[in-house]
């Protein structure tokens, strides 16, 4: 069974554009190898962190939205944890509500006054 996930991770700010793209591609391929589908990548760019993480005040924010089996998350997060380029990451399970068809309203009989 596949589930929708969202992963946000922060890359070190001292990475160049090419190194950042290589890191993004690396994690995208890792997810794809684990059976993920519908991978959407949003590069949020370099932003100031709310607090210092591993002696960095800025970071490159990357957001991934994808559909994957539950077994794909552990190896993906392990690779991020062991990586020097990722300073923080978070994966959440998304609850996407199924659209329910609108209820049809039954017509109520209207009272008609008879005129004589």
UniProtKB/Swiss-Prot annotation:
<dbReference type="Pfam" id="PF01250">
    <property type="entry name" value="Ribosomal_S6"/>
</dbReference>
<dbReference type="GO" id="GO:0003735">
    <property type="term" value="F:structural constituent of ribosome"/>
</dbReference>
<keyword id="KW-0699">rRNA-binding</keyword>
<dbReference type="InterPro" id="IPR020815">
    <property type="entry name" value="Ribosomal_bS6_CS"/>
</dbReference>
<dbReference type="GO" id="GO:0005737">
    <property type="term" value="C:cytoplasm"/>
</dbReference>
<keyword id="KW-0694">RNA-binding</keyword>
<protein>
    <recommendedName>
        <fullName>Small ribosomal subunit protein bS6</fullName>
    </recommendedName>
</protein>
<dbReference type="GO" id="GO:0005840">
    <property type="term" value="C:ribosome"/>
</dbReference>
<dbReference type="InterPro" id="IPR000529">
    <property type="entry name" value="Ribosomal_bS6"/>
</dbReference>
<keyword id="KW-0687">Ribonucleoprotein</keyword>
<feature type="region of interest" description="Disordered">
    <location>
        <begin position="97"/>
        <end position="116"/>
    </location>
</feature>
<dbReference type="GO" id="GO:1990904">
    <property type="term" value="C:ribonucleoprotein complex"/>
</dbReference>
<comment type="similarity">
    <text>Belongs to the bacterial ribosomal protein bS6 family.</text>
</comment>
<keyword id="KW-0689">Ribosomal protein</keyword>
<dbReference type="GO" id="GO:0070181">
    <property type="term" value="F:small ribosomal subunit rRNA binding"/>
</dbReference>
<dbReference type="GO" id="GO:0006412">
    <property type="term" value="P:translation"/>
</dbReference>
<dbReference type="InterPro" id="IPR035980">
    <property type="entry name" value="Ribosomal_bS6_sf"/>
</dbReference>
<comment type="function">
    <text>Binds together with bS18 to 16S ribosomal RNA.</text>
</comment>
<dbReference type="InterPro" id="IPR020814">
    <property type="entry name" value="Ribosomal_S6_plastid/chlpt"/>
</dbReference>
<feature type="compositionally biased region" description="Basic and acidic residues">
    <location>
        <begin position="97"/>
        <end position="110"/>
    </location>
</feature>
<dbReference type="InterPro" id="IPR014717">
    <property type="entry name" value="Transl_elong_EF1B/ribsomal_bS6"/>
</dbReference>
């Amino acid at each position: 069974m596949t589930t929708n996930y969202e992963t946000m991770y922060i890359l070190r700010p001292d990475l160049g554009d090419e190194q950042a793209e290589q890191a993004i591609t690396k994690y995208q391929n890792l997810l794809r190898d684990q059976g993920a589908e519908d991978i959407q990548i949003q590069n949020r760019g370099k932003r100031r962190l709310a607090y210092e993480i591993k002696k960095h005040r800025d970071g490159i924010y990357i957001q991934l939205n994808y559909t994957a089996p539950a077994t794909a998350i552990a190896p993906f997060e392990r690779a991020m944890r062991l990586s020097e380029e990722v300073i923080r990451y978070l994966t959440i399970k998304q609850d996407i509500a199924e659209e329910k068809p609108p209820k049809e309203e039954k017509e109520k009989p209207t009272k008609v006054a008879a005129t004589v």
